[in-house]
């Protein structure tokens, strides 16, 4: 990896982390918050980011060349979104979050098998193991929720969906040699926005009312707009830079685990410094392990 690669990767760590900060600000300050409405807003502004970044060079005429990738990305995103929400409803949250984090293994393994990424060194494999341990420690808590077959299915949906989001993006860059990147993401995010809008509109029961109230509140409270706008732009930047790293032949075994480990470290740091949150011993240990894995992954 070159100095430029490391600079891009570091910028991705920060752009990925600030998305969580903006989300927290929104959910703390919104009178009637809706995760689906907020996600829809961020996706729309991520789409706008790609429109702006591609101004003057966008060409949708060869859409059939990248449409399969866009459909796969949107399907994976929708699968992950539905899986994560249903897993929360039907089983333990912490365990679901832990297994969900294992989705980073999918682009790592498929990157080696399908995309021709180099086999990670023993040190990087050790870094990946330490990262998984740190995620396990971070989510170590007793929960009363019972594990059911449905919960396992929904967790698997989340893992597979998240993993294939990352892999599909990398595959599009690799197999189409960096062409149609903006067009691919604009089409993908438009499809994702449609999926989220359908979830918000056609959801059943109390959730539908919460989403409707959340949407109206979001429109009325202009002070909340900035969080969705900034998070969406940061999301767009994150995706664009990840695609740049793939185009520069940085392997998935470095990109995804590094972003996960760095995100863990920066998120804990932000929680302590910005929100004065008290951290349990498990979180402190997880923070330290995340820092160690970050170093090992980039040796």
Residue ranges and their predicted role:
Residues 1-299:
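Polytopic alpha-helical membrane proteins, predominantly small-molecule transporters/carriers
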